[in-house]
Amino acid sequence: MQKKLSRWAEEDPAKRFTDLYSLLCNETWLRVAQLHVNANRGRETAGVDRRTMSNFLGNLDGNIERLRETLKAKTFEPMPVRRVYIPKANGKLRPLGIPTIDDRIVQEALRMILEPIWESDFSIHSYGFRPNRSTYDAISYIGNRLTGKGWTFQWVIEGDITSYFDTIR
């Protein structure tokens, strides 16, 4: 289905996708999303509800059905994230928000729906949080541009936005 979504988005950039919510409520789609979340090494990190993936798997069928029903009834509400702080190399602490397992599964299901559609709209020069792209790809591209024939640059600007994610509301 993701390949179809991607193909439709590429073939018709003006296409309106009108029934994506039914995918989100699809049991198989939620099961695949759960498998993706389960493959993450943070699967045993609990959110504010104190449930881990092991807890979720203890009643997998019931939990998937419960999630599906709340999504279908449009009564699903994400929980607050659990805030933890991890040490950074400079000695400061970096805040992390840990979603519940339910929220992670729904977020992954949404990513699985939206990513193939939006990918065709993104710039080929965008590397952050993109499938099959990494910081190494971005560095390689920049290196090739800086050393390639016919290209001359007068400036290279390096930047870092301090505590950027802390300022997003």
Where are the language model's segments positioned?
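Short helix-interrupting loop/turn segments at helix-coil junctions
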Residues: 114-120
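Reverse-transcriptase-like RNA-dependent polymerase core
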Residues: 31-37, 69-92, 101, 105-114, ...
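Short, conserved non-catalytic motifs in the polymerase core
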Residues: 41-56, 78-105, 121-134, 157-158
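Generic recognition of stable, solvent-exposed alpha-helical segments in well-folded globular domains
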Residues: 12-15, 19, 28, 32, ...
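Hydrophobic alpha-helical scaffolding
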Residues: 10, 23, 100, 128, ...
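Non-catalytic, polymerase-adjacent accessory regions of viral genome-replication enzymes
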Residues: 1-62
